[in-house]
Protein backbone atom coordinates (compact mmCIF):
# COMPACT_ATOMS: atom_id res chain seq x y z
CA UNK A 1 0.00 0.00 0.00
CA UNK A 2 1.04 3.66 -0.25
CA UNK A 3 1.86 3.83 3.47
CA UNK A 4 4.57 1.19 3.09
CA UNK A 5 5.69 2.51 -0.31
CA UNK A 6 6.21 5.97 1.15
CA UNK A 7 8.95 4.89 3.57
CA UNK A 8 10.54 1.68 2.21
CA UNK A 9 13.64 2.26 0.10
CA UNK A 10 15.96 5.17 -0.31
CA UNK A 11 14.67 7.28 -1.80
CA UNK A 12 11.11 6.24 -1.03
CA UNK A 13 8.74 5.39 -3.86
CA UNK A 14 7.44 8.42 -5.76
CA UNK A 15 3.65 8.70 -5.48
CA UNK A 16 1.70 10.78 -8.00
CA UNK A 17 -2.04 11.46 -8.05
CA UNK A 18 -3.95 11.27 -11.31
CA UNK A 19 -6.43 9.26 -13.32
CA UNK A 20 -6.17 6.15 -15.45
CA UNK A 21 -8.18 5.43 -18.58
CA UNK A 22 -7.45 2.81 -21.24
CA UNK A 23 -4.03 1.98 -19.80
CA UNK A 24 -2.90 5.62 -19.71
CA UNK A 25 -2.13 7.46 -16.47
CA UNK A 26 -2.60 11.23 -16.62
CA UNK A 27 -1.64 13.70 -13.93
CA UNK A 28 -0.44 17.29 -13.87
CA UNK A 29 2.75 17.36 -15.99
CA UNK A 30 2.70 13.53 -16.24
CA UNK A 31 1.43 11.08 -18.87
CA UNK A 32 2.37 7.41 -18.87
CA UNK A 33 1.00 5.12 -21.58
CA UNK A 34 1.10 1.35 -21.90
CA UNK A 35 0.04 0.44 -18.37
CA UNK A 36 -1.43 -3.06 -18.15
CA UNK A 37 -4.66 -2.03 -16.48
CA UNK A 38 -8.33 -2.00 -17.38
CA UNK A 39 -9.10 0.40 -14.53
CA UNK A 40 -10.75 3.74 -15.04
CA UNK A 41 -10.79 6.65 -12.60
CA UNK A 42 -8.60 8.25 -9.93
CA UNK A 43 -5.47 6.37 -8.85
CA UNK A 44 -2.11 6.94 -7.22
CA UNK A 45 0.83 5.90 -9.38
CA UNK A 46 4.09 4.83 -7.79
CA UNK A 47 7.56 4.43 -9.29
CA UNK A 48 11.11 4.16 -8.00
CA UNK A 49 13.68 6.84 -8.86
CA UNK A 50 16.11 4.27 -10.24
CA UNK A 51 13.49 3.00 -12.72
CA UNK A 52 13.05 6.40 -14.38
CA UNK A 53 15.51 8.23 -16.63
CA UNK A 54 16.14 11.74 -17.89
CA UNK A 55 15.12 12.37 -21.51
CA UNK A 56 13.87 9.58 -23.75
CA UNK A 57 11.96 9.35 -27.03
CA UNK A 58 8.54 9.65 -25.41
CA UNK A 59 8.99 11.42 -22.06
CA UNK A 60 6.39 10.88 -19.35
CA UNK A 61 7.18 14.03 -17.39
CA UNK A 62 8.00 17.60 -18.36
CA UNK A 63 8.52 19.59 -15.20
CA UNK A 64 10.85 22.16 -13.66
CA UNK A 65 13.77 20.92 -11.58
CA UNK A 66 13.15 21.54 -7.88
CA UNK A 67 16.53 20.35 -6.58
CA UNK A 68 19.53 18.21 -7.49
CA UNK A 69 21.75 16.08 -5.28
CA UNK A 70 25.13 14.84 -6.51
CA UNK A 71 25.78 11.36 -5.10
CA UNK A 72 29.07 10.49 -6.79
CA UNK A 73 27.79 7.61 -8.93
CA UNK A 74 24.53 9.39 -9.85
CA UNK A 75 22.59 12.63 -9.64
CA UNK A 76 19.19 12.63 -7.95
CA UNK A 77 16.94 15.10 -9.78
CA UNK A 78 13.83 16.19 -7.90
CA UNK A 79 10.73 17.70 -9.51
CA UNK A 80 7.65 19.24 -7.91
CA UNK A 81 4.68 17.79 -9.78
CA UNK A 82 1.15 18.76 -8.76
CA UNK A 83 2.32 19.49 -5.22
CA UNK A 84 4.20 16.20 -4.88
CA UNK A 85 7.94 15.67 -4.87
CA UNK A 86 9.12 13.20 -7.54
CA UNK A 87 12.69 12.02 -7.98
CA UNK A 88 14.61 10.55 -10.92
CA UNK A 89 18.05 8.96 -10.64
CA UNK A 90 20.13 10.45 -13.46
CA UNK A 91 23.64 9.92 -14.78
CA UNK A 92 26.37 11.31 -12.53
CA UNK A 93 27.26 13.93 -15.16
CA UNK A 94 23.71 15.28 -15.58
CA UNK A 95 23.33 18.96 -14.71
CA UNK A 96 20.37 21.34 -14.95
CA UNK A 97 19.47 24.67 -13.42
CA UNK A 98 16.87 24.87 -10.67
CA UNK A 99 13.61 25.85 -12.38
CA UNK A 100 14.72 24.53 -15.78
CA UNK A 101 12.09 22.30 -17.40
CA UNK A 102 13.45 18.81 -17.95
CA UNK A 103 11.89 15.75 -19.59
CA UNK A 104 11.98 12.36 -17.88
CA UNK A 105 10.72 8.91 -18.82
CA UNK A 106 8.96 6.56 -16.42
CA UNK A 107 8.60 3.09 -18.01
CA UNK A 108 5.06 1.72 -17.65
CA UNK A 109 6.40 -1.75 -16.77
CA UNK A 110 7.97 -0.39 -13.57
CA UNK A 111 4.89 1.50 -12.31
CA UNK A 112 2.64 0.45 -9.44
CA UNK A 113 -1.01 1.51 -9.13
CA UNK A 114 -2.78 2.20 -5.85
CA UNK A 115 -6.39 3.00 -5.00
CA UNK A 116 -6.63 6.80 -4.67
CA UNK A 117 -8.85 6.54 -1.58
CA UNK A 118 -7.65 3.53 0.42
CA UNK A 119 -4.02 3.50 -0.74
CA UNK A 120 -4.18 -0.26 -1.33
CA UNK A 121 -2.27 -1.68 -4.29
CA UNK A 122 -4.43 -2.47 -7.31
Q: Which residue ranges define each predicted feature?
A:
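Conserved beta-strand-loop-alpha-helix hinge in the C-terminal portion
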Residues: 1-9, 13
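Non-catalytic connector elements of ABC transporters
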Residues: 11-15, 22-122
Amino acid sequence: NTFVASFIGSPAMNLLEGTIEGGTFTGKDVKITGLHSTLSGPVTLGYRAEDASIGGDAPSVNAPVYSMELLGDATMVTFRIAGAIATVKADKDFRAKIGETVAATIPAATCHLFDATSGERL
